[in-house]
Amino acid sequence: MEKQIHGGNIYDKEVSLDFSVNINPLGMPDGVQDAILNNMSGYETYPDIRYTALREAVAGKERVQADRILCGNGASELIMAVVRAEKPYKCAVAAPSFSGYERAVSAYGAETEYYKLDEKNGFGYADACSQLKDMDIQMCFICNPNNPTGNLIPEDILVNILDICRDRNIVVVADECFLRFNPQYEIISCKRFLDDYDNLVIINAFTKFYAMAGIRLGYMMSAN
């Protein structure tokens, strides 16, 4: 069976409308376009290797400490970086979900074990916790809202997953790249759990909500 790759590969096909990556149809904000055009001379120099100003700006937007933020070239690179840093030998991934998790896991020689979402109930997470309890894993990926199903993880199940993984020293990687489309982002984001779960890593990006796919900019948040 042919493995699917990340969407957006429109260059060897005649594509007029690309539905593979779900980017904001409103397009890139005018302020971003203006900032790029008005700072062209800045591209002649290397960026700050610590991304100090960027991390502080993200910290202000997310209302978290700057030292809890790490920036990278999009969410996909950061997913790879987490797996590379933690070196798990088996990771849990929802099915169905974003294929990039399995790709990152495989790239570093680890194994993927799937916890299956309930297709009969809109691909819900009702059985996720019981499945995770029986898995011998070191890392668990959750996508909230899930891609491609679009459903949010209910609050009680989300907390249960975090508790299960914390008690078993399992790193939780929470992908929230689509969550900012939800008006309640500030209330439902996992960042509110950073003080309570030192095993939690949250990944976000400017790609989807801000329609900045070509700029390749993402960030992760973690307690440590």
PLM regions with names:
Residues 1-45, 170:
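N-terminal "arm"/small-domain region of PLP-dependent enzymes with the aminotransferase-like
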Residues 22-24, 75-76, 98, 144-148, ...:
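Short glycine-rich anion-binding loops that position phosphate/pyrophosphate groups of nucleotides
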Residues 50, 63, 114, 195-224:
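Conserved core segment of the aminotransferase class I/II
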Residues 51-91:
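Phosphate-binding glycine-rich loop
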Residues 69, 91, 112, 172, ...:
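Hydrophobic/aromatic residues located in beta-strands of well-ordered beta-sheets
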Residues 85-142:
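PLP-dependent aminotransferase-like
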Residues 123-136, 148-168, 172, 176-210:
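Active-site pre-lysine segment of PLP-dependent enzymes
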